[in-house]
Amino acid sequence: MLSRPWQAPVSKIKEETMKRKCILLVLLCFMVIMLFPSVPALAEDTHYTYTYDWWGLNRESPDAYEANTSITGDKLGIGDFLNPQGFFVRDNLIYVCDTGNNRIVVIEKADGVYRLKEVITEFTGETDINTFSGPMDIFVTGKGEFYICDTENQRVVHLNANWELVKELVRPADETVDQESSFYPQKVVVDSSGRAVVLVKNYNKGFVEYKNTGEFSGFIGANEVKFNMIDYIWKRFATKEQRAQMETFVPTEYNNLALDKDEFIYCTTSVFKERELQNDKAKPIRKLNAMGTDILVRNGEYPPIGDLMWGNAAGVSGASKFVDVTAMDNDTYFVIDRTRGRIFGYDFQGNLLYAFGSLGNRLGYFNYPTALEHMDNNLLVLDSGNVSITVFSLTQYGQLINDALMEYKRGNYDTSAAYWEEVLTQNGNYDLAYIGIGRSLLRQGNYKKAMEYFKLKYDEENYSKAFQLYRKQWIEEKIGWIVGIFFTIIILPSLIGFVKKIKREVEEE
């Protein structure tokens, strides 16, 4: 069959048109790339920091911390870590409990580089077992002595600076402790007097406390007993067999602890009902004094509970579940959340400074965060999923916030306000900067100006405080005028009337 004479030319025209379109498309793409050279960098953007405003809404923020490196066993030349569960920082040394490999890995930071210092798998001294089995935590004292939770060996070993055994802390031989129960120490801290506080698995009476001699001295910081009223009433009428099958009302357990510079114990728990977070009954972060009383200040707009929004995102939902805490020398503290892989920073009043981090496999993201520490201002996160330590360094923005808080605590309110002003130039949505300036003005006696800043961010408590002081100040400043006006309006007319009355009486006589 012969083709029509116009078919070939039409086909050729279409082909030429398509070629021109392809060339134009390529040129257009090239022009876009040239016009926006930063576009490819967006894929590597690590800005994932945020905070919450007065309304409880998520507000993006400049990064206060940025991830700059990760430390792995492979990079150190000793093979990968295996399920590491705890670590500790003292000066420029990092002590890692490489739990699955039954060893302690010591890492040294020198000239900004992290290098292997030594690997400890055994120690000397009079004991039947001088190796570790599943070590889960380590604490290093100021004297360079070590307390290691040798978990599977059911003991805490106290070693001197030469890795020689000093003593063992074992299950207390006390009537308050079930002598048939297992003793699996998981976390430990030691104060300057040698008092050791140990978190033991399935011990729900609080932390186990030992004297510096190794003698058991009791429990500290027992969690409040939580129970359901309906279950309680049901138990009153249930049979013995039914009661045995029901859940026993016991205090919930802690999951980690840390000492601050003043040797108060910060601790975390993730055993609570989510509704208890909303009315601030859960208290997932606590600060215990020597008596075990919670003294954590919670003056923020929202309690320190992590995320305020728990909706499903990327298959993750539910409240934040903190698994570790670390306290800085300026009384700010940080917690790591396993639910979404986030770090939350709070000031000494319980205000959220910022939150950052997420789940993932990139630098600065986490798989299964296990522990949190700090080295100077740097934050370090141990991840048992990624078998690595991620190091976060403070940014210039984060340093401004730290400086503002520190100067306020030192009583340098003018300087503190100046730092907060600089913060606002980088983040105009930062509520805490306005409140910080207001608090500085309040301390300086500039109550009227302080009221303006508190009003901007709906800080009713501080506004009320500033208003009362401003009213008192105003009255004190105007007291002369007030007395004068009172005398002129009330006293003077009465006095004039009295004088006239006397005068009339005298004239009548």
PLM regions: where:
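Short, Lys/Arg-enriched N-terminal segments with co-localized hydrophobic residues
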Residues: 4-17, 431
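Positively charged, low-complexity intrinsically disordered regions
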Residues: 5-8, 21, 116, 205
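Sec-dependent N-terminal signal peptides
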Residues: 21-31
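C-terminal segment of classical bacterial N-terminal signal peptides
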Residues: 32-40
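Eukaryotic scaffold repeat domains enriched in small/polar residues
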Residues: 42-447, 457-458, 464-509
